[in-house]
Each structure stands twice: as C-alpha cells, then as structure tokens.
Swiss-Prot record:
Matches recorded under InterPro entries: Ribosome_maturation_RimP, RimP_C, RimP_C_sf, RimP_N, RimP_N_sf
Pfam families: DUF150_C, RimP_N
Descriptive protein name: Ribosome maturation factor RimP
NCBIfam families in UniProt: PRK00092.2-5, PRK00092.2-6
Species this protein is from: Rhodopseudomonas palustris (strain ATCC BAA-98 / CGA009)
Cellular component GO terms, alphabetical: cytosol
Coiled-coil region list: none
Signal peptide interval: none
Similarity section: Belongs to the RimP family.
Amino acid sequence: MTEPTPAVPETDDLAEPRLVIEPGVAARFCAVAEPVLMAMGYRLVRIKVSGDAGCTVQIMAERPDGTMLIDDCEAVSRALSPVLDVADPIDRAYRLEISSPGIDRPLVRRSDFARYAGHLVKIEMAVPHQGRKRYRGLLDGVEGDAVRVQREGATKDEDPLVLLPMHDIGDARLVLTDELIAESMRRGKQAERDLKQSLGLAPEPPPHAKRSDPKKSHAPKRGPKAAKAPTKPKPQNTKQHRLAADKSRRGEIDTSEGD
C-alpha cells in the first residue's frame, strides 16, 4: 500500500502544546509516541490506557487540519509499533489502537477551541470556576488564556457568557449535533480528495471554464429578423360574390365589372 503523504504543516502547528497531560503509564507512551508523530507530520491528541478485556493503549492522532484518514492510522501504526517495542513503556502485553479523535472529539489545544467556535461543547473543570465544575454551551472562541462559552441554562439574572481558564480545564469535548456531523464529513471528504490527488490516484480538479470576452458579452444582441406578415387573403364568399353568381346564372351582366 502506498504511504499517505500529508501536506507539510507549519512547524508551529505541530509544536503547539496540549493543555492536557496524561499521568502514569500514558505519560510514558506519550514521551515515545509524540516525537514519532511529529516527524510524520501528525499531532498527538490523547493517549488512553485501559484494562478492559486485557490492556489496550489507544492513541488519538490527527493532521494539523484536524482530519485523520484510515490510511493515516495504518501508517502511524506501522511506524510507531517497532519504536514502542524497543522503548517498552509498559511491563505487560497490550493491544495498540491508533484512531482519529472522532466527531465528538476532545479539545486539547488552544487552536481547537478557536477552530470549533460555534459548536456545542461540554467542559469539566479540574479546578472549579465560580463554584461549578461542569459547563455545557455554545463555544464562542478564545479570549486571552480563557475559553468563551455561552452557557446553557443560565437564568435571566445570570450572564450566559463565561470565561473558563484554559489551564484549569480537565476535559473538554464537542457534543454531537447535526451541524457538527455535516462539518466533519465535509472536512473528511476534502482531506480524502487531497490525499488521492497527492498520490496521483485522482485527477486534479478541472480548470475554470474559459471566461467570455467582456466586449462581446456586453455587446447588444440583435434579435432575429422579423418575418413578413403573410398577406391576408381576399374574402371569397361575400355578399357581392353571391349576387354576381346569381346574375351569372340568370345571364345578366354585372354593370360594376370593369370599373
């Protein structure tokens, strides 16, 4: 299988730090995985180690534009597996899963909160803010080092807009909505088209249609020549014709003829 060739991202996009740091075993996996991902042009999103049905290590990654195709996941898995085998960050067998962040993805960087402004979000604070730990509402972008959220359920006496300090956020993720699904599908289709074109598996988009000459386009158009109106036939059965016919049958001469 041909390896995907991600677009070369800006260095700052790859190096942007995450707001969440995993503890324990997940932190050891992070130390090994993040440099490999960056070298391939991907960003680490989250690492989760679970013991359900054996030990599973899930590594979420993405391109700098927020997309992650199946081919990307396979390429990362092939590159990362031997590196993890050598580093041996855990002392037992585990199953490695490479995945995209998903549609209702976690928000782990400042740029995530800016990119998904206008979508519904739920946030759990590591440090309570204004006596609350959980917030749900419309993401309204970033202001300084805080996330703007138009909070749901605010009373008439409360300001629905809250500013949540980024470094006090424990977990933030998007809420699944029709609008979010539509945007995610659009991003995914565009990323797939870009990948196929870069690999030569799909033709480049056709050039724009040739524009017409403005001088010609603005010239007044002449309409078709009007056809001549057909000559109206002379009446054939008038009173005069009938009288003349009667006289002809009687052998009379019409004195009006020859005038």
